[in-house]
Amino acid sequence: MLKRLILVRGAEIALFVVLGALPLAVESPYALGLLTLLAIWGVALIGLDVTVGYLGQINLAQAAMLGLGAYFAGIAATRYGVGIPLAVVLSGAFCTVVGALLALPALRLEGPQFALATLSFTALCATALNELEWLTNGAQGLQIPRPLLLGHALDARAFFWLCIAILALVWLAMRNLLSSQWGRAFEALRDSPIATDAMGVGTYRHKVAGFALGSGLGGAAGALYAFNFSYLQPLTFVYELTVILLLGVVLGGRKSLWGAVVGAALVALLPNLLSSHLLFRAFSVIAFALALVAGVRGLVRRTTDAFRALAPIAATLTLVIGSFVASNTEDWRKAIFALLLFSVVVGLPEGLMGFASTALARLFRVTPPELPPPAALEQVLPARAPDGAVLLELAGLARHFGGVRAVDGVDLAVTAGTIHGLIGPNGSGKSTLVNVVSGLYAPTRRTLYELRSEE
């Protein structure tokens, strides 16, 4: 365990040392710009991964948080002369508050409804940034001065090092947070919210906190984005950026800081692939070859179903055909990003880092630690009530959700030494009754509710 920890920490240090040293070996301004974007997208994707990877919610509002953070920093710099460190902190704090206010109503929704709510917020923010000309200069865009640090303007190389330093701080803070009690709560929320509630962890409270945290990191990344490009335009932070960010998290690997950085590199490089017809064609052919090999292998070994094997093959084949047919791939950006996202979600749900971790574990035959021996029944149930004793008694129990009466007028007596079953069709209130009895839901009405000890 200690050896593995040393290797992981050493790899993290090596990553940032190599990234920090690259500008000394790279003289191209274009390459330095890509490295700077990698650091900025890394901060944004670490924040998005909290919601998508750990909370299991499809968050389509991260592009809006980037936009709000960028404009907040830009306005603070142009009107009030705020330097870059304070602007990044203030933008992050502002978007944390905005994220919390959005999460309070939105997280009462689940699945597609939550995704639609966050996507609507992104569209609303883009419209507001475009229409509030007195504040944002509207469609004409907002010019931002060069970033200042302690009163001195930063050149491109110094700004890159600042971005890498911020990424390293975010990495360190998130690594410690995700290994703490809060991080374990985030991870449990994705797998089973009901079990998390049953263990006394406030599901809704932790979801709001996680969403706000991810939004704050998105705002901080937006501030860095503003100072990097020195120009902001409202339509930058719309659907296309939303899909690119989501693609970066999924393709890099969810629930992984390494995956966020890998995804950031892909996000930084992907738009540049579309600008070169030859590069995009080569990328499409390689993606199709990988999908074909993985799909056929999964079908032969029966480790995957036909849909998960064939759908990525069809999607990447469409990309290959498009790369030869389309005269200008830039015109098909949204369709290309959507096909890539579909291929990754279906064919590689664990992402590149998850796939690499699994492959390395198989290669080096890494075995998980042995589980402790099962406890004896006497340890789990040290005492038992005499047969016939009433342990649970309900009378007139009801639980309503608005006008829906999920449970209404239930009478029940559970005695020791007996086994009871709830029988009924879907939607008849079986799970709701168990949740009320276990304390997850408060009863709307009850005449008698008594839970007695077995002793």
What positions do the PLM features span?
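Transmembrane alpha-helices and adjacent helix-loop boundaries
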Residues: M1-E378
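The feature captures the beta-strand-to-loop junction immediately N-terminal to the Walker
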Residues: I423-P425
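Walker A/P-loop
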Residues: S431
